[in-house]
């Protein structure tokens, strides 16, 4: 385990104390809001640092008691029993602090753009894409996040050929970023008379939602085309040109939004375009970091098969961390915390291991 950065820990405690004092002094409302945000960010790690100090003192006291030849047998026995528990607590606190002090992904606190596209498997792939969207929608609802569909293309038998949505809330990207990749499903279609299992797939992409300050999109770099929105069967929803297609000329990226309001469509399409460009910048930066290339969980390779959903066996397997759960029904209802948390823990363990190698 890497050595704890004592100087940094002391600085965090000092800053936390300073924030407490300034908040108690009754600053202006806007200043108070900023201080409160920093306070809530620092509180978990400072709490762990203070508990670490108490645990270190407790270990030192117990060892001193055991080293003292005048300690009676009863006290010695109690100290010998207590020491392993305190040392285990100390080790846990050290690991917790190291995780808290890991370099933060600047995008973690952002909302996200969720894109799901049917892959191989025709109608079954579209149905599965719909199942995945509902799974994430329920997961988001459980977190108090807001989901808004930006654009969608329905499959012939239901589900979606493609669906793009915003998931808005604090820390959305940190929870969903490891969902990017190919999701494979194995199940017996309703139309299958012989009971044969079919395999199909859908691709998920999760992008941090970019704001105007994150990425600049110059007016001369885009072409905006308006079209008539089409409903089921190609019928026009209205008589005005409302669908918007934005092409980013330098990269060739094309984004379309086809809701009823042209103004909303332009804003939504720009929102997705900014997020895709921001994601491209992040992917480029990540590929230049050898540490990220070593991390399979953190690679974000959207061509990689990351998870298999086997309906006949009620089994879900995440291939990146070799995690298998027989909770498919519950997961499809949005209960994906166990997989999400395991992926985050694996990524953090990889970061800690790299710090240990550098120490």
Curated annotation (Swiss-Prot):
InterPro entries documented for this protein: PCRF (IPR005139), Pep_chain_release_fac_I (IPR000352), Pep_chain_release_fac_I_sf (IPR045853), Prokaryotic/Mito_RF (IPR050057), RF-1 (IPR004373)
Region: Disordered, residue numbers: 282-309
N5-methylglutamine found at: 235
Subcellular location: Cytoplasm
GO terms for cellular component: cytoplasm
One Pfam family, short name: RF-1
Biased composition regions of type Basic and acidic residues, renumbered to the chain: 282-307
Superkingdom per UniProt: Bacteria
Mod. after translation: Methylated by PrmC. Methylation increases the termination efficiency of RF1.
Presence of the UniProt keyword Protein biosynthesis in the record: yes
Gene3D superfamilies reported for this sequence: 3.30.160.20, 3.30.70.1660, 6.10.140.1950
Keywords (A to Z) from UniProt: Cytoplasm, Methylation, Protein biosynthesis
GO molecular function: translation release factor activity, codon specific
Function comment: Peptide chain release factor 1 directs the termination of translation in response to the peptide chain termination codons UAG and UAA.
Similarity section: Belongs to the prokaryotic/mitochondrial release factor family.
NCBIfam families per UniProt: prfA, PRK00591.1
Protein name per UniProt: Peptide chain release factor 1
Protein species of origin: Allorhizobium ampelinum (strain ATCC BAA-846 / DSM 112012 / S4) (Agrobacterium vitis (strain S4))
Species classification: Bacteria, Pseudomonadati, Pseudomonadota, Alphaproteobacteria, Hyphomicrobiales
């Amino acid at each position: 385990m890497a050595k704890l950065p004592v100087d940094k820990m002391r600085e965090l405690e000092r800053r936390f104390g300073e924030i407490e004092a300034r908040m108690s002094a009754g600053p202006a409302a806007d200043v108070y809001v900023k201080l409160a945000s920093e306070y809530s960010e620092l509180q978990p790690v400072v709490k762990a640092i203070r508990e670490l100090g108490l645990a270190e003192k407790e270990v030192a006291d117990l060892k001193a008691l055991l080293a003292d030849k005048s300690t009676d047998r009863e006290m010695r026995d109690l100290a010998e029993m207590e020491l392993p528990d305190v040392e285990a607590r100390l080790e846990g606190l050290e690991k917790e602090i190291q995780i808290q002090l890991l370099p933060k992904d600047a995008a973690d606190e952002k909302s996200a753009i969720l894109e799901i596209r049917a892959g191989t498997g025709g109608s079954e792939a579209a149905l599965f894409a719909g199942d995945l969207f509902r799974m994430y929608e329920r997961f988001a609802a459980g977190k108090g996040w807001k989901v808004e569909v930006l654009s969608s293309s329905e499959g012939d038998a239901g589900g979606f050929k493609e669906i793009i949505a915003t998931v808005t809330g604090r820390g959305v990207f940190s929870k969903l970023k490891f969902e990017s990749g190919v999701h494979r499903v194995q199940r017996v279609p309703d139309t299958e008379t012989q009971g044969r299992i079919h395999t199909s797939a859908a691709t998920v992409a999760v992008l941090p939602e970019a704001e105007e300050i994150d990425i600049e999109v110059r007016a001369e770099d885009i072409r905006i085309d308006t079209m008539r929105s089409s409903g089921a069967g190609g019928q026009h929803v209205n008589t005005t040109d409302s669908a918007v297609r934005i092409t980013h000329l330098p990269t060739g990226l094309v984004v379309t939004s086809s809701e009823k309001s042209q103004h909303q469509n332009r804003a939504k399409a720009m929102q997705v375009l900014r997020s895709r460009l921001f994601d491209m910048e992040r992917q480029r930066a990540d590929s230049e970091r050898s540490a990220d290339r070593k991390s399979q969980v953190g690679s974000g390779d959207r061509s990689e098969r990351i998870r298999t959903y086997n309906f006949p066996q009620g089994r879900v397997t995440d291939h990146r961390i070799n995690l298998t759960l027989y909770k498919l029904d519950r997961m499809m209802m949005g209960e994906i915390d166990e997989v999400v948390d395991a992926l985050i823990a694996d990524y953090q363990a990889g970061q800690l291991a790299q710090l240990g190698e550098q120490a």
